[in-house]
């Protein structure tokens, strides 16, 4: 399962970290993410408030 975590704060970091440990997770993206998340997720340079860009990214990486 591919997962996109939207945000850059501590809660999103904790959620992304938990997802990264799942055997079901095949790809993990964080938008915009933070340096800590970059250790276990692919951070993409999309603002968490840019809904159109987030939807486009999710559709392209389905």
Enumerate the language-model features and the residues they cover.
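ATP-binding N-terminal substructure of ATP-dependent carboxylate-amine bond-forming enzymes
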Residues: 1-62
């Amino acid at each position: 399962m591919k997962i996109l975590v939207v945000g850059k704060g501590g809660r999103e970091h904790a959620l992304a970290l938990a997802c990264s440990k799942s055997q079901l997770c095949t790809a993990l993206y964080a938008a915009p993410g933070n340096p800590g998340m970059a250790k276990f997720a692919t951070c993409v340079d999309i603002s968490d408030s840019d809904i159109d860009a987030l939807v486009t990214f999710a559709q392209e990486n389905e």
